[in-house]
UniProtKB/Swiss-Prot annotation:
Residues 435-485 are annotated as: Disordered. GTP 1 binds at residues 9-16, 56-60, 119-122. The keyword NADP does not apply. GTPase that plays an essential role in the late steps of ribosome biogenesis. The gene is der. Residues 350-434 form the KH-like domain. Residues 457-469 have a biased composition (Basic and acidic residues). It comes from Neisseria meningitidis serogroup B (strain ATCC BAA-335 / MC58). InterPro entries: AAA+_ATPase, G_ENGA, GTP-bd, GTPase_Der, KH_dom-like, KH_dom-like_a/b, P-loop_NTPase, Small_GTP-bd. This is GTPase Der. One of its GO terms (biological process) is ribosome biogenesis. The keyword Nucleotide-binding applies. Associates with the 50S ribosomal subunit. Keywords: GTP-binding, Nucleotide-binding, Repeat, Ribosome biogenesis.
């Protein structure tokens, strides 16, 4: 599992700026696709060979007892519980504040390692900036600049040093490894119990039970499977905003380790933004996806039609996924769900022959040429497979930068139908053939044309005539001498 790093601190100390630096992006983890909820609180990062997850917790005002700031403080404390390491960010320009001292007191009570980072330290004397923050008793401060990157690498390198090198991903297994993901209280734990055929206690409120996903190997109808149990993220009692928010972290970690994700929805509730966000993580990671709409037996026919319309409207970007309407409690629809898991796994791990890929590409071009972009028309020559889980098709040609998104969607649907890629995302990459003379400096220089005057041409012509006449005379003389002998 990737270690999770939580960014904690007062408002306006630069947590979002540091988050963007650590994730190397200014956008959300989820692509800006229609229907996907943008979420700037979670992101991926990597230093060397070590990947990590980072959480931007929002501003922490511990002295507020109610309102939105109080909720943000609750979410921050939840982040500390869920994280593997905590970066406590303070403002080097403002200096030490009473709120910083209160936050530090709470962080010292946590068993998680805490790293004190003095932000906005660009251009200043590091020793002077760090001096007053030793009062927080959180070890040596790291003086950094989230905006310019100063000192950030050393901070993250020290954090990750305590975590082992990542092992080979579980997604490389030769059988389906699937994760049950979704919001709290949608029936994930019930579905896990129905799948395994036994009651398992997975909702204990004990330290550790909500932190690590459990990998369980089992067989069903003679076929091996591995399930990643993330149901332990749910806590007893009321599921508040903080718990629901951090269920996303569990989904991210589980999706990374799986090759198939099973997204569980609650038919008794409307499709929430969080559902779309979690689905977006699976799509971003390129994992095969199966959707289980749970508690289907407990709603009326009218409600069923409403749920289907809601799904079509809010999750239409999952048109490649198979939807199953099940009852985990009564174990209805589980067999069909497993058939789709196996099919999605097979599609994600498919090996496509290059000749067939190219034939499908040429057939698609014959049916519909790519539209021109100004005076340029893209020319696609051949294609081959570039990867699995998800399948990647690499198209080679010229002027491929001019291919529109709509034509890419057309090609995606064509390849999906030709290879029966049900349940997995399909990615198309364009590889433009390079012109060796693209730069003017590299072009071979043509010889300049010589201008020859008319008089020079006449002189040359007369000279050739005289030469020819002299040759004829010599020939006649030599022939006469030969016969005279």
């Amino acid at each position: 599992m990737k270690p999770t790093i939580a960014l904690v601190g007062r408002p306006n100390v630069g947590k979002s700026t540091l988050f963007n630096r650590l994730t190397r992006t200014k956008d959300a983890l989820v692509h800006d696709l229609p229907g996907l909820t943008r979420d700037r609180h979670y992101g991926h990062g990597k230093v060397g060979s070590k990947p990590y997850l980072v959480i931007d917790t929002g501003g922490f005002e511990p002295v507020v007892d109610s309102g939105i700031l109080h909720e943000m403080a609750k979410q921050t404390l939840q982040a500390v519980d869920e994280a593997d390491a905590v970066v406590f960010l303070v403002d080097g320009r403002t200096g030490l504040t009473p709120q910083d001292k209160i936050i530090a007191d709470r962080l010292r009570q946590s068993p998680r390692p805490v790293y004190l980072a003095v932000n906005k330290g660009e251009g200043g004397n590091r020793a002077v900036l760090a001096a007053e923050f030793y009062e927080l008793a959180l070890g040596d401060p790291y003086v950094i600049s989230g905006a310019h990157g100063d000192g950030v690498y050393y901070l993250i390198e020290d954090i990750l040093e305590k975590f082992p090198e990542p092992e080979a991903e579980e997604a490389d297994a030769r059988h389906p490894v699937f994760a049950v993901i979704g919001r709290p209280n949608v029936g994930k734990s019930t579905l896990v119990n129905a799948i395994l055929g036994e009651e398992r206690v997975i909702t204990f409120d004990m330290a550790g039970t909500t932190r690590d996903s459990i990998h369980i190997d089992f067989e069903r109808e003679g076929k091996p499977f591995t399930i990643i149990d993330t149901a332990g993220v749910r806590r007893r009692g009321k599921v508040d905003e903080a718990v629901e928010k951090f269920s996303v972290i569990k989904a991210m970690q589980a999706v990374e380790a799986a090759n198939v994700a099973v997204l569980v929805l609650d038919a008794q509730q409307d499709i929430a933004d969080q559902d779309a966000t979690i689905a977006g993580f699976a799509l971003e990671a390129g994992r095969a996806l199966v959707v289980a709409v749970n508690k289907w037996d407990g709603i009326s026919e009218e409600r069923r039609e409403q749920v289907k319309r809601d799904i079509n409207r809010k999750l239409y970007f999952l048109d490649f996924a198979k939807f199953h309407f099940i009852s985990a409690l009564k174990e209805r629809g589980i067999d069909g769900l497993f058939d789709s898991i196996q099919a999605a796994y097979n599609a994600a791990m498919i090996k496509m022959p290059t000749p067939k890929i190219t034939r499908v590409l040429q057939s698609a071009i014959e049916r519909q040429q790519p539209p021109r972009a100004g005076l340029v028309r893209p020319k696609m020559r051949y294609a081959h497979q570039g990867g699995m889980n998800p399948p990647v098709i690499v198209v080679h040609g010229n002027s491929l930068h001019a291919i529109s998104d709509s034509y890419t969607r057309y090609l995606t649907q064509t390849f999906r139908k030709a290879f029966n890629l049900q349940g997995t995302p399909l990615r198309i990459q364009y590889n433009v053939s390079e012109n060796p003379y693209e730069n003017a400096e590299d072009k071979p220089k043509k010889k300049p044309l010589r201008r020859v005057s008319l008089s020079n041409r006449i002189e040359k012509r007369e000279g050739r005539k005289e030469e020819k006449n002299r040759f004829k005379k010599k020939t006649k003389v030599s022939v006469k001498k030969q016969f005279s002998k």
